[in-house]
């Protein structure tokens, strides 16, 4: 499970949720993930994330494995992560759709023309020339760039000393089962021991809110992907623990029962990235604390309205905010602690919950970072209350819905 937080204060609270899970027989490995963009906004380094993770493990007396993820890294920024991280999410989105060398394309087509039947799937995968050409022109350059990035990390860090994930989710269209099969086969052929793959799914995975789309279609795609992974592992020598990774995975409550049911059906693993919404739980806790902490939470919102375009433009593909549905300054200025928390907390049964308010605050962590020591002071002064929000959110609203809901 991708955890961690932008302000590096909630690791122990998150581990508390995982310790509750462990007592119920649910084994979850925490992965602290933070991207290069987030480090630049927060003026932090990968070493800061490593320090925070190690400190949280000591504080919580965590006895299991844990990792620090260089999240969404490329060849341009990977070097700063190599010393501190032992999990690397290779982001090759910029290479998807770029053309590989013609000789590589023709070789890919020639070696993949045999029919492929995946047990559990009604139809064989499409391996006609047109299908293979489309796959090669769309993904082959990205696959080769992932292999180059992996090799660069291995040459510096050493073989077997880190976990590799490949991200293919930041594209317009979902991969077909055939796409995923040949992506994984090609990664294996190039010697990339991929342990997690993040494909694109149909529908919108907006930041910090529920899934928007056809749940039945998602279920079909998720199940087909699990079947493909199972077969590729048998054929290719990729790690037996190769799993699907769900990015922007927090708060997708309508999908969690589907995911849980299918990973149990196929005895499969799952990597769910949730770290981005931890700061919203911090903000909820500060609102509930009242006084100056509540006033700071309100001021962060007021500033976010003034800087709407600046804050939302980097996330335009993963948010959907109707500015007309955002509560006006005059209204929020008069809110009590409970009113602010009710509007922010992701509780769809609460009529006060405002999905637009939540999404805007999700991308407004830059403003909290500008408060710097003042924001951290309020977090530490209200550590127990804030930590309670973080632990309950991760366990009650995420882990339980995936792993304990049998429906």
Each language-model region and where it sits:
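Conserved, mostly hydrophobic/aromatic
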Residues: 71, 166, 247
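Short, well-ordered beta-to-alpha junction loops that form the rim of enzyme active sites
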Residues: 168-170
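Hydrophobic "anchor" residues on beta-strands that sit immediately upstream
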Residues: 67, 165, 243
């Amino acid at each position: 499970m991708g955890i961690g937080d932008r302000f590096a204060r909630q690791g122990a609270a998150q581990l508390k949720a995982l310790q509750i899970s462990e007592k119920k027989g649910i084994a979850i490995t925490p992965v602290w993930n933070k991207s290069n963009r987030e480090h630049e906004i927060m003026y932090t380094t990968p070493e800061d994330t490593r320090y925070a993770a190690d400190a949280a493990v000591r504080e919580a007396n965590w006895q299991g494995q844990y990792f620090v993820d260089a999240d969404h890294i490329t060849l341009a920024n990977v070097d700063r992560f190599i010393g501190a991280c032992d999990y690397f999410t290779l982001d090759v989105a910029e290479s998807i759709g770029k053309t590989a060398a013609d000789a590589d394309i023709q070789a890919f087509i020639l070696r993949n023309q045999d029919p492929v039947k995946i047990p559990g799937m009604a139809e064989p995968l499409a391996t006609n020339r047109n299908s293979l050409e489309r796959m090669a022109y769309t993904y082959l350059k990205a696959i080769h760039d992932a292999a180059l990035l992996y090799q660069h990390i291995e040459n510096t860090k050493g073989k077997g000393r880190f976990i590799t994930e490949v991200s293919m989710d930041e594209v317009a269209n979902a991969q077909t089962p055939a796409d995923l099969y040949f992506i994984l086969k090609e990664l294996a052929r190039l010697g990339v021991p991929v342990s997690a793959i993040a494909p694109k799914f149909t529908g919108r995975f907006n930041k910090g809110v529920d899934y928007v789309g056809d749940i039945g279609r998602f279920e079909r795609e998720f199940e087909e992907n699990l079947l493909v992974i199972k077969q590729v592992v048998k054929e290719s020598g990729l790690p037996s623990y190769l799993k699907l990774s769900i990015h922007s995975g927090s708060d997708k409550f309508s999908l969690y029962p589907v995911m849980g049911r299918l990973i149990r059906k196929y005895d499969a693993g799952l990597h769910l990235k949730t770290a981005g919404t931890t700061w919203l739980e911090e903000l909820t806790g500060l609102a509930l604390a009242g006084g100056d902490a509540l006033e700071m939470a309100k001021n962060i919102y007021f500033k976010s309205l003034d800087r709407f375009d600046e804050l939302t433009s980097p996330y335009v593909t993963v948010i959907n905010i109707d500015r007309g549905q955002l509560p006006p300054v005059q209204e929020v200025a008069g809110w009590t602690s409970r009113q602010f928390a009710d509007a922010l907390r992701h509780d769809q049964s609460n009529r006060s919950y405002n999905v637009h308010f939540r999404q805007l605050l999700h991308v407004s962590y830059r403003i909290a970072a500008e408060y710097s020591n003042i924001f951290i002071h309020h977090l530490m002064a209200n550590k127990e209350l804030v930590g309670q929000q973080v632990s309950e959110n991760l366990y009650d609203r995420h882990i339980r819905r995936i792993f304990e809901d049998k429906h």
